């Protein structure tokens, strides 16, 4: 959410930013917000003037009564009562205006970083760099669920009977591999200086609206019936929520947390073979990282965060590349975002395995996450988040890139201690 003062003073910048994000339907909101802001300030001024006049007039009542001027005192009382009624009327309108103003402000997108390429959607994202050499083996790489089935490692039919589409049972070595990836990711991030965190897996609506747009909320979140609670779609929301309504001395920043959690999302593709299996599902696990920092440090932390993901994948010999998300692919709260994609030998192309985002002060402004400077002045922090690894998608990349012609799957050195020392997985069928 933008600062209303910024919108008031820079309406054309805000409108051009909306055009750059190809959201022209929101242009009228800028003028509407400015009108509501003007009305809100005028109401406050009138209420303040009325209260001052009422206080001044009220003092006359006692003096008039002492002088025996009862009739004049009664007239003054009527004036005071009329002022009070007008104040109540204006206060009610002020509440309505402020609610409408906030509602519209939360729909206007954040100002994107000048370095963000302008484009309509993810097809116009820009490749930044490749890490590792993509390999296409001289044998056919099966679909990831077919590989898993060779190890009796997945049962989607049973999961479908239990929970419906978008769920799975992982079994045996594949389930162990999944857990090994998470354990390694946890230790990897702790070694990078992040504090390990196990957060709540449900959050209240004020936290949900503080960390994402209404559109994202509708598309992603499962609401608990009869409760002001939502299942988290990612642990970054719960971790950022930890700092709601806080004021942190700037010398105590940055706050760097990493968390493993299950994630629950309504989204699921309806078409296309790549939507089968564990690529896009309702429930999955993820190792996430967040940073709460001073504004001048957020760009530096942004680069550190996405590099963590690249480094993690490279320890498992999986080629990856980074993509700069274009303006139209950025969610409304994001200032800048980079996707990390892993190489798929089967598809002979890269696919998304993680995303790193700088939210600027958008989440902090909504959640009142503030910093106190050495001069005692307070300002909003910047927040960032990044995926270290989401094991379901990592399993796809891992199995495809480590599969051998005879069906064995090699286990990189980094994971072996979490797999009981195993150097490979041998298919059972």
Where are these regions (language model features)?
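N-terminal alpha-helical targeting/anchoring segments
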Residues: 1-134, 149, 153
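TRNA-recognition modules of translation machinery and tRNA-sensing kinases, especially anticodon-binding
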Residues: 27, 130-429
């Amino acid at each position: 959410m933008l600062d209303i003062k910024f919108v008031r003073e820079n309406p054309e910048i805000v409108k051009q930013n909306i055009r750059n994000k190809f959201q022209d339907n929101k242009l009228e909101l800028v003028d509407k917000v400015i009108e509501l802001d003007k009305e809100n300030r005028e109401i406050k001024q009138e209420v303040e003037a009325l209260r001052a006049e009422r206080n001044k007039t009220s003092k006359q009542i006692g003096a008039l009564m002492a002088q025996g001027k009862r009739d004049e005192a009664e007239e003054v009382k009527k004036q005071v009562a009329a002022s009070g009624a007008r104040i109540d009327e204006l206060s009610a309108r002020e509440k309505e205006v402020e609610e409408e103003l906030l509602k519209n402000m939360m729909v206007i997108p954040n100002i994107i970083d000048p370095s963000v390429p302008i484009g309509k959607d993810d097809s116009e994202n820009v490749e930044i760099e490749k890490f590792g050499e993509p390999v296409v083996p001289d044998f056919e790489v099966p679909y990831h669920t077919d590989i898993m089935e060779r190890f009796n490692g997945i049962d989607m039919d049973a999961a479908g009977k239990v929970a419906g589409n978008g769920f799975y049972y992982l079994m045996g070595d594949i389930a162990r591999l999944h857990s090994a990836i998470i354990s390694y990711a946890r230790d990897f991030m702790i070694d990078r200086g992040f504090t390990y965190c196990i957060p709540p897996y449900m959050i209240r609506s004020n936290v949900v609206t503080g960390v994402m747009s209404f559109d994202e909320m509708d598309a992603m979140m499962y609401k608990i019936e009869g409760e002001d609670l939502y299942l988290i779609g990612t642990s970054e929301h719960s971790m950022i929520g930890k700092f709601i309504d806080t004021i942190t001395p700037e010398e105590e920043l940055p706050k760097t947390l990493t968390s493993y959690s299950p994630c629950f999302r309504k989204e699921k593709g309806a078409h296309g073979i790549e939507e089968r299996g564990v690529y896009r599902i309702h429930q999955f696990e993820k190792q996430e990282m967040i940073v709460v920092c001073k504004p001048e440090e957020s760009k530096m932390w942004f680069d550190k965060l996405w590099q963590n993901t690249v480094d993690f994948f490279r320890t498992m010999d999986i080629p990856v590349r980074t993509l700069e998300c274009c303006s139209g692919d950025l969610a409304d709260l994001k200032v800048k975002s980079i996707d990390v994609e892993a190489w798929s030998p089967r598809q002979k192309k890269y696919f998304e395995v993680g995303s790193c985002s700088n939210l600027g002060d958008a989440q902090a402004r909504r959640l009142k996450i503030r910093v106190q400077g050495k001069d005692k002045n307070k300002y909003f922090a910047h927040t960032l988040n990044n995926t270290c690894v989401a094991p379901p998608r990592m399993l796809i990349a891992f199995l495809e890139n480590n599969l051998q012609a005879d069906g064995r799957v090699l286990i990189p050195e980094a994971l072996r201690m979490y797999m009981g020392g195993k150097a490979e997985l041998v298919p059972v069928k």
